[in-house]
């Protein structure tokens, strides 16, 4: 994010190289994600902003249920260390409707969610399709596959990544975050029909 705009990672490389390097460092052990193609026309995974059709409190609660002690939301943590803040933007669908949007089912394990494991280096292209707003429904909870992933991470003593096996809406371009509501993942869900995107300070 630069100013009030959330940029795809690949655009950050030109716009804000220091922030790009900080975000890129989060791909340690899964660097192949940086070159992962998600469409026949060559669109890359990180040519998009990754949004989730799930209230972030569901992610927090799933971790709490398993005793993973997720951190409380804290804006200063991201500002001072670049680490996860627990804060998300609430993004109404009509706010991004003029952009190219893809629906990503996130079913098949690949290096993005399983760093340093023997899994494919790119996701199957058939898990991506043009986004259809008329079919969109917010997920009521994390997927069964995500819950199983969290259990596996706990059993192996590893820190879980945030959105493994959670479907995504991928936005192929920047998102103006001015006037978007910021929500904390440790606050309970309200009834809304929007997407969430991680706040990057």
Which sequence ranges carry the predicted segments?
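Active-site-proximal loop/hinge segments that shape catalytic or ion-binding/gating pockets
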Residues: 1-49, 56-201
């Amino acid at each position: 994010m630069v100013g009030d705009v959330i940029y795809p990672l690949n655009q950050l490389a030109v716009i804000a190289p220091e922030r790009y390097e900080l975000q890129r460092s989060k791909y340690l052990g899964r660097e192949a994600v940086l070159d992962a193609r998600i469409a026949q026309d060559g669109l890359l995974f990180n040519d998009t902003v990754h949004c989730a059709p799930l209230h972030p409190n569901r992610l927090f609660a799933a971790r709490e249920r398993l005793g993973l002690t997720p951190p409380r939301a804290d804006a200063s943590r991201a500002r001072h260390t670049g680490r996860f803040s627990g804060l998300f933007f609430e993004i109404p669908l009509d706010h991004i409707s003029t952009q190219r949007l893809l629906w990503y089912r996130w079913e098949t394990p690949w290096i993005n969610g399983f760093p340093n494991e023997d899994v494919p280096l790119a996701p199957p292209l058939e898990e991506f399709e043009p986004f259809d707003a008329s079919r969109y429904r917010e997920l009521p909870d994390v997927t069964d596959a995500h819950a199983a992933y969290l259990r596996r991470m706990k059993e192996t003593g590893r820190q879980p990544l945030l959105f493994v096996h959670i479907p995504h809406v991928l936005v192929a371009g920047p998102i103006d975050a001015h006037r978007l509501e910021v929500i904390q993942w440790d606050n309970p869900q309200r009834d809304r029909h929007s997407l969430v995107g991680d706040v990057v300070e």
